[in-house]
């Protein structure tokens, strides 16, 4: 693919099956969220037969790939990551067009893949070390086996970063991969695979594009698929779990969140703190699983907090992400925008206070695209959809509390358990309270995966997911324990 900012032509991508790039008679069109009449490109509308061939190719390639040591596989993977440092500006322009990110967000995601995954490769030496212990009349050893064929299904909001959080650990562990990119934002991810595929043996990584309704069941029920790694919505995960249960496949899920942020009376309301909080809420137009989705603030500081927070939010510049002055792009789809507007309207009907903020320099462009201004909703009912559901949009509800234990209880009263945060100048007290949040990843005075040490895992509990990404735990998601015991006379 060639993507030039000043000479734009639609990109027509292909599928990768058994080392061969292939197409199909039908195509899926990809349009720009900022300019919905602009065709960004197309991908093949793959069929179940394409999935069958990709799985067969992955299965055939897996034994030889698995026969290498972790260190040998790491040596093969390392040059892939170096390749992914190239063409960032060109690839970012494509990413912005198909996704709606800002240029800064697109560059950060693309550049973050090699830097993060180099840390994954550093774990190879640790993985090569078996654990052993005395056993009755002999010795016992603990080693690890790959699952085999892993299906990787990723969403549109961060497809490149999230895909490689699955692909690299899976490959390092000795698995082969069948990747299903998101149908509304597949091009940047396929471009990345084009860059690395020549360095891998045929069949080690395969790419099948298509509509979930047409190829999803084959991907998740096929008897030769040993594990499914999925990032996406809870309803889709339930269907995947049901499909995977037919053959008891391994499964890793990274799902939605409704993360609370609890401010204490002594919370820092200065510019830097408010910018960190606003970034967590409005990054990627609020279309992030681990982000602040609800704010709980003491009644005593509600006014001061709202003044400080809205002053920061009002500086956000909304528009086409190809403009480097823009700090928040459009919603990804018209359907997502309609839902966001509906749940905000519902809150308003319940007498909530809705503040529409931000700067819109290009008002004509704003009207054409799937744009929405950053919004703060206060005085909201606890059972309003904006509070209860994952809104996945640039709007955040604010509720007040008098007793911090009540705030913790309300924060935990959800099916979600991805992230949560406590904001206070008293780090010790905030840390103690953060540990009371029923979430897999918790924070003090910050909120988001970018704040987590990249050598450590993150993930959700409850209905926000199963398993972990990153760190040694993230690699072992793609490994199975094998215990070997010898009897020695």
Regions found by a protein language model. Give the residues of each.
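ALDH superfamily catalytic-core signature
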Residues: 10, 235-381, 444
């Amino acid at each position: 693919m060639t993507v030039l900012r000043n000479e734009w032509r639609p990109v027509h991508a292909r599928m990768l099956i058994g080392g061969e790039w292939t197409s199909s008679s039908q195509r899926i069109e990809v349009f720009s969220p900022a300019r919905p009449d602009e065709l960004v490109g197309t991908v093949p509308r793959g069929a179940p037969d394409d999935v069958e061939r990709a799985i067969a190719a992955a299965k055939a390639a897996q034994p030889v790939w698995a026969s290498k040591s972790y260190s040998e596989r790491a040596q093969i993977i390392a040059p892939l990551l170096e390749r992914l440092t190239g063409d960032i500006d060109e690839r970012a322009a494509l990413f912005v067009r198909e996704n709606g990110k800002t240029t800064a967000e697109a560059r950060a995601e693309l550049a973050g893949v090699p830097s993060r995954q180099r840390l994954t490769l550093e774990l190879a030496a640790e993985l090569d070390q078996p654990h052993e212990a005395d056993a009755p009349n002999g010795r016992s050893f603990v080693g690890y086996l790959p699952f085999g064929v892993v299906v990787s299904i990723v969403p549109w909001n961060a497809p490149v970063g999230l895909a490689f959080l699955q692909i690299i650990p899976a490959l390092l562990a000795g698995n082969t991969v069948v990747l299903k990119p998101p149908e509304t934002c597949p091009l940047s991810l396929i471009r990345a695979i084009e860059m690395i595929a020549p360095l891998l043996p045929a069949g080690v990584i395969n790419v099948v594009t298509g509509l979930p309704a047409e190829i999803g069941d084959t991907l998740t029920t096929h008897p030769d698929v040993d594990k499914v790694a999925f990032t996406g919505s809870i309803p889709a995960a339930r269907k995947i779990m049901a499909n995977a249960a037919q053959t008891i496949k391994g499964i890793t899920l990274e799902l939605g969140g409704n993360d609370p942020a609890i401010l204490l009376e002594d919370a820092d309301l200065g510019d830097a703190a408010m910018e960190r909080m606003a970034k967590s809420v409005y990054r990627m137009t609020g279309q992030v699983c681990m982000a602040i989705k609800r704010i709980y603030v003491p009644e005593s500081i509600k006014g001061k907090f709202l003044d400080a927070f809205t002053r920061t939010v009002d500086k956000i510049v909304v528009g086409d992400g190809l403009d480097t002055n823009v700090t928040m792009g459009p919603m990804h789809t018209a359907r997502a925008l309609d839902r966001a507007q509906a749940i905000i309207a519902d809150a308003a009907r319940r007498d909530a206070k809705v503040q529409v903020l931000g700067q819109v320099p290009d008002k004509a462009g704003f009207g054409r695209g799937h744009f929405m201004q950053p919004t703060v909703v206060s005085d909201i009912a606890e059972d309003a959809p904006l509070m209860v559901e994952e809104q996945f949009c640039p709007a955040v509800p604010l509720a007040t509390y008098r007793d911090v234990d009540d705030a913790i209880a309300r924060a935990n009263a959800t099916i979600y358990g991805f992230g949560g945060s406590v904001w206070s100048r008293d780090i010790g007290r905030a840390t103690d309270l953060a540990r009371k949040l029923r979430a897999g990843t918790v924070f003090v005075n910050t909120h988001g995966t970018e704040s987590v040490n990249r050598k450590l895992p993150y993930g959700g509990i409850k209905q926000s997911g199963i398993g972990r990404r990153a760190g040694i735990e993230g690699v072992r998601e793609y490994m199975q324990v094998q215990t070997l015991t010898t009897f020695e006379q």
